[in-house]
A protein has these predicted regions:
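Short catalytic/metal-binding and nucleic-acid-binding patches
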Residues: 1-161
Length: 161
């Protein structure tokens, strides 16, 4: 079956910094991401992203959630983040028996309240999926504002960069 036509990507006005909640999935929803080697490759890829800030990420077995924003260039699309990130992970891992699903899901976070709700959603995802009993026990979470594995207590602590 052919894929439905895709809408062209949109960019927002330049007057305000933007933060997105982005979900990337593994093709066929294969459970390959919750692995120490893959997690290291993901962290390396995020550190190599030059045009995007990653405020937090939760890596699930078959998908990953990110809270991201462009550093300075307002003309960037979420597709630029997804493409660049996937390429960097692939380069870091070398050959892999799996591939990323095409595209991504993204949601523009319009307020601190929205940012907080998505942060909590991502943090609690391993609990909802029955992988751990407490979110703090999930090893495949990090942010680049606080200590790895520790979430900011409020969106303003996440310092929208």
């Amino acid at each position: 079956m052919a894929e439905p036509p895709r809408l062209s990507e949109m960019t927002l006005p330049e007057e305000k910094s933007v933060i997105y909640f982005v979900t990337l999935c593994v093709k066929g929803r294969r459970k390959v991401l919750a692995d120490a080697k893959v997690f290291d490759a993901i962290k390396t890829a995020i550190q190599q992203l030059r045009r995007w800030n990653v405020l937090a990420a939760v890596i699930m077995p078959d998908h990953a959630h990110f809270i991201v924003g462009p550093r300075e260039e307002r003309g960037l699309s979420v597709g630029d983040f997804a493409t660049g990130f996937k390429r960097l992970v692939r380069q870091s891992l070398g050959f892999q028996s799996w591939e990323w699903q095409r595209g991504c899901f993204d949601h523009l976070l319009r307020s601190d309240e929205n940012l907080e709700s998505k942060r909590i959603y991502a943090q609690d995802n391993p609990v909802r999926h029955g992988l751990v009993q407490k979110a703090e026990a999930w090893p495949y979470y990090f942010d680049f504002v606080n200590d790895p594995g520790k979430l900011a207590t409020s969106p303003t602590e996440a310092q929208r960069i």
